[in-house]
Amino acid sequence: MNSPSPSKEHIATFHTHFGALTFHKKLKALGDNAVMMPVPRKLSASCGTCVKFSLPFDHAWADEDLEAVYLHEERDYRLLFENEET
């Protein structure tokens, strides 16, 4: 039996804790196993809280509180989205 391929891990960073909480709730409602956590040291964020998730990122989720979205690739992070409203 083949095991399913692992989900891609994304990290979303935010300007505010409220933004992180709102994004987390949105992903949970979509069925993702999203987790709020401290931002990894390699990344920087205004509020220090990020959301780790596995669904493919949809640009429609972006609002003024979203700072950036990264794809976690082995030992590094690749920028997928950066909010131009910052």
Describe each model-derived feature in a short phrase.
Residues 7-8, 66:
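A structure-centric signal for secondary-structure junctions around beta-strands
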Residues 8-11, 17, 21, 25-60:
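Amphipathic, hydrophobic secondary-structure cores in small proteins
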Residues 55-86:
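C-terminal structural segments of small proteins and small subunits
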Residues 2-5:
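Short, flexible turn/loop "capping" segments at secondary-structure junctions
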